[in-house]
A protein has these predicted regions:
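Catalytic phosphate/nucleotide-handling subdomain of diverse soluble enzymes
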Residues: 361-387
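N-terminal beta-alpha lobe that positions the nucleotide/phosphoryl donor
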Residues: 2-20, 24, 28, 40, ...
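Residue-level signature of transmembrane alpha-helix interfaces in integral membrane proteins
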Residues: 125, 131, 194, 341-342, ...
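Conserved helicase core region in the C-terminal RecA-like lobe
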Residues: 326-327
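Beta-strand scaffold of nucleotide-dependent catalytic cores
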Residues: 323, 334-370
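Short intrinsically disordered coil segments
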Residues: 94-96, 338-339, 371-374
Length: 387
């Protein structure tokens, strides 16, 4: 499929541009200390990075500290939101680059959707203890979700009003664009999607979120992926087959699909999951969250990530953090959208605003090349009423 290849190519190209420039969030008052610290960290790690990369797992390198299943109780979840944060920008070894920068942005008052970071120590423990977690983690995650609920005013798994939906993303110390996994719109099931539809009075939006969630979760967490005998990704094949049958055009733009189309595709997705896994798609939001966290930690040791770390001398024992964050939506209609932005041109370093966006889309659409993205300079023209 040309479209699928274009998406993958676009993701790689866009991800490479966005590898590092996006996370400069410290204030002018802190600039000098941050620079000194960054220099110190680079000097301290230069020798380690210069050495040949040893093919070891996190468990081997840190086994003496985390090999016991009765590890010492500690703090594993660091929250942020509403102008407060448990962490800060200097904590990248523990919180990963994304988590540390989100915490710093919250601390300086930027409008960051609330969330929490599960630290890299949990990743170390995960690999040292047969993919299990510290006993304290579940309670700390529940406290983190409760904090997001309080700030956003929605409840996780609520089937009576607007439900809290969350995004689960990786966050290594050094940026590894496109190498690990992301799940969006987590928390949807057959009941909460109806609540979302009623609360927003936007059926297409609600069912589009559910379709996206099943597709991402099925791929990343449940392993419903292309078999050696198949030419295309199975979920994409389902979508294109439906478009051909219902509309006579397998390459119809996704935004042209209505709520009834999306409902039909979702039923086919569920059948695909049952056929490939032998189990129904999980409906319990907490089960969904636990599966997503495990999948992100698992993606630290996938083939893509291993090859990338070898190329850029990133030690395996660093591990990745996991960021759990309240969803904001760019797919509610033509007055919403998603994009990426930089305070400098990522290709040249020139001090000019640079970005690209798509209307009526979620973030993965921009990096995957689902539709041609538009330059950031066009935002004012297309959305003149935006602040």
């Amino acid at each position: 499929m040309a479209k699928k290849a274009a998406r993958a190519s676009k993701r790689s190209a866009t991800a490479a541009r966005s590898a590092r420039p996006a996370a400069r969030t410290t204030t002018p008052a802190r600039k000098a200390p941050a620079a000194r610290k960054a220099t110190s960290v680079r000097k301290a790690t230069a020798a380690r990075k210069a050495a040949p990369v040893r093919r070891v797992t996190p468990a081997r390198r840190t086994g003496s500290r985390a090999s016991s299943s009765t590890a010492k109780a500690g703090k594993y979840v660091y929250g942020w939101g509403a102008g407060k944060a448990d962490g800060n920008g200097s904590m990248k070894p523990l919180l990963g680059g994304k988590g540390a920068n989100l915490a710093e942005m919250a601390r300086i008052g930027l409008p960051v959707p609330p969330g929490f970071t599960i630290s890299t120590e949990v990743c170390t423990y995960f690999y040292a203890n047969k993919r299990t977690y510290p006993v304290e983690l579940q309670a700390q995650m529940k406290s983190g979700i409760a904090r997001i609920e309080k700030i956003m005013g929605h409840r996780f798994g609520d089937a009576t009003s607007f439900p809290l939906l969350i995004a689960v993303r990786s966050g290594a110390r050094d940026s590894m664009p496109g190498m690990m996994d992301t799940i969006l719109n987590l928390g949807l099931n057959d009941q909460t999607v109806l609540a979302l539809e009623t609360a927003t009075r936007n059926p297409r939006f609600a069912w589009d979120c559910y379709r996206r969630f099943i597709q991402m979760y099925g791929d990343v967490v449940l392993g419903v992926q292309k078999l050696p005998s198949e030419d295309h990704e199975p979920f994409e094949s389902v979508i294109e087959q439906y478009k051909e049958e219902a509309h006579g055009d397998a390459h119809l733009d996704d935004t042209r699909l209505g709520a009834d189309d999306l409902k039909a595709i979702i039923e086919r997705f569920k059948s695909l999951v049952l056929e490939r896994t032998g189990k129904a798609f999980p409906s319990d939001p907490w089960e969904q969250l636990q599966g997503a966290v495990g999948a992100v930690f698992g993606s630290w040791m996938n083939d893509r990530a291993i090859v990338y770390r070898r190329k850029y001398n990133i030690p395996a024992e660093w591990g990745t953090a996991v960021n759990v964050q309240g969803m904001v939506f760019g797919n509610t209609g033509e007055e919403s959208g998603s994009g990426v932005a930089f305070t400098r041109d990522p290709a040249t370093g020139e001090k000019v605003f640079y970005g690209e966006f798509l209307m009526n889309a979620q973030g993965e659409d921009v990096v995957a090349g689902v539709r041609p993205a538009k330059g950031g300079g066009l935002m004012g023209r297309e959305q003149p009423k935006s602040p």
